[in-house]
């Protein structure tokens, strides 16, 4: 069976009720989806200087490089290959032949920081522009090495910058599509080392791809559950009063799942962004 990853965007609501989409908004979404047909997954989005920068895994299971798509209207996109990360630049004895995948990019001040998976390791890069040139923030070493633990998968790192300027990193998954674990720690100002010791913050029915957002003083930990290769994959969320929780799953979770009337599956590993006064979810799915 051919697997095609489709990157899509849709309106999203995290306020305890289902999102309401007007006819005008629905038409806009329909015209834009899918955004990138092909083998692209695990999107991360940055808005900078009037343009959208979408970072993606260039193949469903990782490649020797990562790519970035750029647009100023969210409809017409140009492809760019990044100088970092590459498998050659992100290799340790523990990463072996695993590829690079699942990029996550955040801006803090005048610097962009990227967190990327390679095997069961997390690497951190930095740049002054979304397209680079990028460099490894820690020389030739991973930020979270593969020997951290053998009980969970060290992948899918995502940074969150709070209103007070403090920054946090969330990451973690499970083995064999089960028993996902999510960890969090406050970051130092360099965004590539920890100020606090990592703690487990795993919410209900968590597997991978954590993403933190803040709304009206509450912390929303969004994440994927299930197998990315089948209809069990979906996006859920839980709410807490601080970046470390505890997090209680909301009543309208999941907020993204398979539509039984469509021949698609595996919607998830998302990112959230705001534009034009609306909040959107960007995600991949299989067809």
Where are these regions (language model features)?
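Carbohydrate-active catalytic/glycan-binding domains of CAZyme proteins
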Residues: 17-287
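Bacterial Sec-dependent N-terminal signal peptides
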Residues: 1-26
């Amino acid at each position: 069976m051919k697997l095609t990853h489709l990157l899509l965007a849709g309106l999203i609501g995290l306020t305890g009720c289902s999102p309401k989409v007007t006819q005008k908004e629905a038409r806009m979404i329909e015209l834009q989806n899918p955004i990138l047909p092909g083998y692209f997954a695990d999107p991360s989005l940055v808005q900078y200087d009037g343009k959208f920068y979408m970072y993606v895994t260039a193949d469903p299971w990782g490649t020797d490089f990562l790519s970035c798509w750029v647009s100023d209207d969210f409809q017409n996109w140009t492809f760019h290959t990044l100088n970092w990360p590459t498998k050659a630049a992100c290799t340790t004895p523990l990463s072996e032949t695993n590829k690079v995948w699942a990029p996550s990019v955040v801006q803090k001040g005048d610097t962009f920081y990227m967190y990327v998976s390679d095997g069961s390791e997390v690497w951190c890069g930095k740049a002054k522009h979304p397209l680079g040139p990028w460099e490894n923030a820690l020389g030739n070493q991973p930020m979270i090495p593969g020997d951290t633990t053998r009980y969970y998968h060290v992948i899918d790192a995502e940074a969150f910058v709070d209103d007070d300027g403090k920054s946090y990193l969330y990451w973690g998954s499970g083995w064999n599509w089960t028993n996902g674990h999510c960890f969090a720690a406050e970051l130092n100002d360099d965004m590539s080392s920890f100020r606090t010791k990592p703690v487990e913050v795993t919410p209900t029915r968590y597997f991978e791809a954590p993403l933190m957002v803040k709304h009206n003083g509450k912390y929303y930990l969004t994440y994927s559950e299930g197998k990315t290769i089948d209809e069990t994959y979906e996006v859920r969320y839980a709410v807490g009063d601080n970046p470390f929780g505890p997090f209680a799953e909301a009543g309208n979770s999941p907020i993204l799942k398979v539509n039984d009337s469509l021949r698609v599956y595996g919607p998830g590993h998302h990112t959230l962004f705001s534009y034009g006064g609306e909040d959107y979810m960007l995600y991949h799915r299989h067809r």
